[in-house]
Amino acid sequence: MPLWTAPSTSAVDRVRAAHRENVGAESAHVASAPATWALIGEHIDHYGGIAIMGLADIRAAAAVSPRSDGLVKVHLEHTNGDTVKDEISLEQVSALAAQQQPGVDSEGQPIEPPAPEGAIAARLGGIIYTMINRQLLTRETAGADITVVNDIPDSTGLGAAAAIDIATALALLGTADDLHDAPLRARIAEVCSQAVGTFARFPALRARHSAALRGAGDSITIIDYADGSVTQAPHMINKDIAAFALAVPGDVDSAEAVAEIRARERFIDAACRAFGTPSLRLLPDAPQRVLEWLAAVHKVHGTENQPTIAQATAWLTFYSEETERAEGIARALRSRRGTELFPLLTQSQSALATVYGFNSAEKLAQLATARGAVASRSAHAGTSSAVIAYVPSARATNFAADLAEDGLLVIPLSAGSPAITED
């Protein structure tokens, strides 16, 4: 397979033309957002750890125009030529939101709602619904035509869906005066993550939305959920190190992994409710106390829909140790000690497979290392079998050519820029 290259014309120009062709009118507003890649932290995002993200120079663009019939119609064009058309009414979106409200059983225990299964129209319609309810859009909003051109290859762990979320949200906001202000961008990221968690089939990764909106092209974004800070550190891709996303072409069956991720998130949420804490990371002596609480839950309510003590021990161990690794990587980035990064990334990949139980990318990571990468780590273990490989610049060209010749999808990662409106 040849080395992946971006289309020669911008996604913004193509989405304007596609919207004109499919809707029959010019778009009201257009916005674009970058691909995002995780250095570390995508599986401790919900725990309240540290997520470290980069932006890539591949983008998704969205064009919107208003409707008056209560429908959200989506036309999505992928970089591989696939086209998706989907629609939903805002009334249906409201009904889906109601289904996600938790109940309580006869013993006072919360009843978890079914996992959302929404496709692209429900996902983007959910963003509109949430923006209305969070007073980012007027309640007079009565639907939208949304056209999306996505240049980010799917199943590569580069956050195509999150980029579409952000591009759509910014386009819906149009020419608002304060779209570049950090407080509003933080609010937009929060709204997108909330909507995805309520309506979409794949769980939300908050760090992608935050990085796409608040990152910077020439630096790495560090999101620390202990205090909610979003800061920048010197970029690790430089004259000495190149980075690539590597993936096996084709769709990945991630249904089982998605269910596993949701089960772990429910466990974290239940423990946080039990201890009255916003995140387990902020709970003193969390592993011991949470395991004692879980044992009590087993004793009183049984083990149905609950992890075993062994499973919970492994998860909590991973969360704690991965947060420590993320802290070490953040320190190394800030002090420009690049050689300290790669052992920590290798340890993280090993822990994902052996401790956390997500080994979908393990063989590809091993192959990349064998071919000359100084480190390779899953792009998003569970939902993708892709890896991010870090290669000395002197070997980068041969590395990419060899793996492309083996039939892998090889995407060079260059620094991107944050999401913007394109009006």
Where are the regions that the model predicts?
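C-terminal nucleotide
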Residues: 1-36, 40, 61-114, 224-376, ...
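Gly/Ser-rich oxyanion-binding loop with an adjacent helix/lid
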Residues: 1-30, 34-53, 108-238, 247-249, ...
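FabD-like malonyl-/acyl-CoA
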Residues: 162-165, 386-390
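Catalytic-core region of right-hand nucleic acid polymerases
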Residues: 52-55, 60-62
